UniProtKB/Swiss-Prot annotation:
InterPro entries according to UniProt: Cyclotide, Cyclotide_bracelet_CS, Cyclotide_sf
Domain comment in the entry: The presence of a 'disulfide through disulfide knot' structurally defines this protein as a knottin.
An example Gene Ontology biological process: defense response
Highest taxon of the lineage: Eukaryota
Record's comment on post-translational modification: This is a cyclic peptide.
UniProt protein name: Cyclotide vico-B
Length: 31
């Protein structure tokens, strides 16, 4: 929830989700 994963999730889910990232405010964040 605090560290950006350098990925947006406006149109597609977070590919970095496999690394623990999740979508928040159209941006992928880690924890």
């Amino acid at each position: 929830g605090s560290i950006p994963c350098a990925e947006s999730c406006v149109y597609i889910p977070c590919i970095t989700g496999i690394a623990g990232c999740s979508c928040k405010n159209k941006v992928c964040y880690y924890n």
